[in-house]
């Protein structure tokens, strides 16, 4: 394949969009596979493996000159550490919520983070909420209520388990919003790019996660055997590694998508991606398919599309040039992700 063909492929909008969706779905499903394994209770270990694999993967990609990011600097690491600590809180609460809730319900409730972030931007960054954005928020809340109702009606789990799942989901929405808003401010001060952010986030989270797994999780032989039974050990470890690589894929394809299309297109893709993600959860994990669950998924999907359109209109009013692909410097995917809330995951 000649360089001209490779160049055409790299600039095609279809491949990065599909790649982003596949990476996002793959990460969520592999996480759910591990967390739904019978008796699995070592969430911090899972997150440690993911972060370690992620750092190793982007290190290899940097050596191959596929990507580039800053070399480690102790001063920058000290300045960035609080963000990584918030990241640990966010990904741990996300893992607990995903452990107790079905993939469709988890996906729908993640929309609520967008609302918290939007009003956080109003308070701290001078943002504003338009009527159409407010309407999309109403749809998000409605879809979450319908999803919770359908989940409670059809769930075979004990009510205590469901309550735990929704409690972790609320905590995840709050920690997710805190992480995104704090990271936005730090990015402005450090001028970090996508892979700078990814490198420091994952590298600095590793020692925190190692301490948490060593001191809060049961490392007895019996519990290790329960978490990694001989007949499923390889599959669980492979899923852990794949989820770590998928997080790299999400970051890379996010930047790629923004570069060859526009930040608006990226926002829309994030909204549209919720539908196949929810459907994948129904297909692969036998989540109950009821009128309520399907209605909630459709409402969540529509709310995401309306939100993306609202953000597109705001961007158009702010700077007409930015709605045209390749007519401006690419927006940092991490910054855009902050506006639109995705575990990348």
Curated annotation (Swiss-Prot):
Keywords linked to the UniProt accession: Cytoplasmic vesicle, Endoplasmic reticulum, Golgi apparatus, Membrane, Sugar transport, Transmembrane, Transmembrane helix, Transport
Plastid as UniProt keyword: no
Gene Ontology terms, MF aspect: antiporter activity; GDP-mannose transmembrane transporter activity
Protein name as annotated: GDP-mannose transporter
Membrane topology recorded in Swiss-Prot or TrEMBL: Multi-pass membrane protein
Annotated stretches, region: Disordered: 319-345
Keyword Membrane among record annotations: yes
Organism: Schizosaccharomyces pombe (strain 972 / ATCC 24843)
Matching PANTHER family: SOLUTE CARRIER FAMILY 35
A Gene Ontology biological process term: GDP-mannose transmembrane transport
Location(s) in or outside the cell: Golgi apparatus membrane; Cytoplasmic vesicle membrane; Endoplasmic reticulum membrane
Membrane spanning stretches: 9-29, 41-61, 79-101, 105-127, 132-150, 162-182, 195-215, 234-254, 265-285, 289-309
UniProt function note: Involved in the import of GDP-mannose from the cytoplasm into the Golgi lumen.
Cytoplasmic side: 1-8, 62-78, 128-131, 183-194, 255-264, 310-345
Cited NCBIfam families: nst
Subunit (UniProt): Homooligomer.
Family statement drawn from the similarity comment of this UniProt entry: Belongs to the TPT transporter family. SLC35D subfamily.
One of the record's GO cellular component terms: Golgi apparatus
Lumenal side: 30-40, 102-104, 151-161, 216-233, 286-288
Comp. bias intervals (Polar residues): 329-345
């Amino acid at each position: 394949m000649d360089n001209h063909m490779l160049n055409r492929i790299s600039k095609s909008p279809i491949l990065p969009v599909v790649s982003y969706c596949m990476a996002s779905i793959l990460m969520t499903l592999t996480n759910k596979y591990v967390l739904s394994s019978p008796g699995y209770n070592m969430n911090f270990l899972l997150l440690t493996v993911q972060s370690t694999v992620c750092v190793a993967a982007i290190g290899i990609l940097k050596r191959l000159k596929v990507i580039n990011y800053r070399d480690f600097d102790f001063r920058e690491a000290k300045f960035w550490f609080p963000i990584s600590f918030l990241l640990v809180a966010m990904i741990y609460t996300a893992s607990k919520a995903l452990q107790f809730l079905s993939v469709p319900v988890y996906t729908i409730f993640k929309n609520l983070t967008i609302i918290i972030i939007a009003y956080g931007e109003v308070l701290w960054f001078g943002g504003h909420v338009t009527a159409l954005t407010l309407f999309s928020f109403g749809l998000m809340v409605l879809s979450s209520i319908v999803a919770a109702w359908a989940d409670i009606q059809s769930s075979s789990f004990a009510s205590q388990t469901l309550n735990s799942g929704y409690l972790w989901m609320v905590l995840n929405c709050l920690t997710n919003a805190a992480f995104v808003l704090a990271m936005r401010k730090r990015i402005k001060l450090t001028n970090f790019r996508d892979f700078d952010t990814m490198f420091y986030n994952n590298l600095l989270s590793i020692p925190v996660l190692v301490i948490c797994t060593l001191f809060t999780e049961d490392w007895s032989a019996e519990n290790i055997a329960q978490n990694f039974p001989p007949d499923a050990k390889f599959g669980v470890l492979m899923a852990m590694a794949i989820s770590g690589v998928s997080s790299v894929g999400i970051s890379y394809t996010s930047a790629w998508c923004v570069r060859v299309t526009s930040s608006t297109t990226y926002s829309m893709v994030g909204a549209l991606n919720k539908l196949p993600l929810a459907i994948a959860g129904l297909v692969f994990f036998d989540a109950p398919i009821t009128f309520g669950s399907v209605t909630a998924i459709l409402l969540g999907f529509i709310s995401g599309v309306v939100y993306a359109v609202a953000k597109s209109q705001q961007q158009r009013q702010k700077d007409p040039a930015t709605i045209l692909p390749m007519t401006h410097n690419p927006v940092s995917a991490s910054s855009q992700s902050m506006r639109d809330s995705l575990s990348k995951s």
